[in-house]
Amino acid sequence: MQLRHINIRALIAEAGGDPWAIEHSLHAGRPAQIAELAEAFHAAGRCTAEANAAFEEARRRFEASWNRENGEHPINDSAEVQRVTAALGVQSLQLPKIGVDLENIAADLAEAQRAAAGRIATLESQLQRIDDQLDQALELEHDPRLAAAERSELDALITCLEQDAIDDTASALGQLQSIRAGYSDHLQQSLAMLRADGYDGAGLQGLDAPQSPVKPEEPIQIPPPGTGAPEVHRWWTSLTSEERQRLIAEHPEQIGNLNGVPVSARSDANIAVMTRDLNRVRDIATRYRTSVDDVLGDPAKYGLSAGDITRYRNADETKKGLDHNARNDPRNPSPVYLFAYDPMAFGGKGRAAIAIGNPDTAKHTAVIVPGTSSSVKGGWLHDNHDDALNLFNQAKAADPNNPTAVIAWMGYDAPNDFTDPRIATPMLARIGGAALAEDVNGLWVTHLGVGQNVTVLGHSYGSTTVADAFALGGMHANDAVLLGCPGTDLAHSAASFHLDGGRVYVGAASTDPISMLGQLDSLSQYVNRGNLAGQLQGLAVGLGTDPAGDGFGSVRFRAEVPNSDGINPHDHSYYYHRGSEALRSMADIASGHGDALASDGMLAQPRHQPGVEIDIPGLGSVEIDIPGTPASIDPEWSRPPGSITDDHVFDAPLHR
């Protein structure tokens, strides 16, 4: 969450409390360690059938909620059990009862933590959306063309948005207070039962937040939401190696998605969470001597929730993506990193990003953003398109002495398909662009060395997302590449990208119908002229202008499809094809050699307005553009078919 206009301190004051502080107090607890202690007590006693059933039910509740621990636990279970066993003497039947009580505490805490984290994630999404809308509204306030009535409407909208932020925060605060109160009540009841069973609870000290007093051994405080990547990085580098490993083990979900943490560390954390999501189902299948498919087919029978199954399926898709990209070259496997991972994001479609090569050490980094129909759930990370792999291999061949890392970024909620009504509006692009900007800007903070070059590439609806990340999200990169772009929304020209010397490159096949949608921008503006609120919220139909037009200020490279005869929707998916004109150009750009496009004959003329020829005395025939018409004439139409081939492969290094 990167807020520009909402002040968190002021928001907390207006809402009457700090929901983030409550969530952090709950996460100070360590439910997995309590569960391990419970299992040790359970195993040490002479278990009755009743105790076994109670323990298994508590264990099921814990496993269904807990997803924050990995690896060995620092608590000395055997020593604690031996201490209590010695105190109880022959009353060993009490040991499994203590195990049940402890397991219930672990389950209650894990459930409270999970509910609190989900509510905070919802709040942050709401605040980010409101902040983005405020940014657009405040920018419009400076427009001298606004009529008095429109300005009044705008002021009312800003006031409404500010109140929405307060109301959303107050609502989250109330829910989190209720979650914490419910856990505290259960904790006190369980502690009373433990004392009745003969256990003083000494092994719980520091593990059962929020009731335990703060001690030096309490978990290290992780930077709160909204903390910038530079501050996070300073915090991370101030920790010892042991402290970092402890955080990765105890709070992998937070560390794995925290911009400012080095890529290798966040990858370790994300892989730990992914592995747990896989093993939650696999271990149950093993325990019941059945198949994973049987467990997936009837999860309730085995004590699993629908959320557990969603986590498993998206973890499986992500693991396939890691394996697929790592096996790129069997003789020389590529190092891969799980840059981001949240299997429950976007209503279960999932969020993940895989890096081929380490962006922290590579001289060049390319981030590719897919378009409509792409998701973790749908298999984009490992399907046959191989967008990231093809770009990685060609950029490496173009300049092997200066490695290029490629991040396949499935970090936003893309429209489901071409029948999804959201595809016609920029709302998802604006929300996704804000998340993309945060991730990309964090790369500059963790990079080692000097001279980093970052290129962000978007395809289809993903190119609209990239444009909004620059224009609205303040994304910092050297170059932008827009492929088959249906419109650039809030980026009205190349200047809106603020590239500081870089370029906006455009690949638009003359036969790709999606890349022509931006030519309808004038019509969209006319239709939406009275819908100010819809424009601000990204709900108005229309995705913006065509960046391949001659007035945009972009650099267009050749991206034609061999043997294509006229407008063809399939040509929209050809850009990353190995040997294509587009991939050849992208490899040059991503490896820092965009200036070679001209000498390689890969530049294309921009689209332009239709014109009429007029004979002017002394000048002869002159073509004049027809005012008010879109840039709908494509010079690439006139290319001889034989000049369009798919043999543009870097067989040997060109740049050393």
Swiss-Prot record:
What segment(s) does the record annotate as region Disordered?
623-656
Q: Which domain of life is it from?
A: Bacteria
Please note every region of biased composition (Basic and acidic residues): 645-656
Supply the name of the protein: Uncharacterized protein MT2140
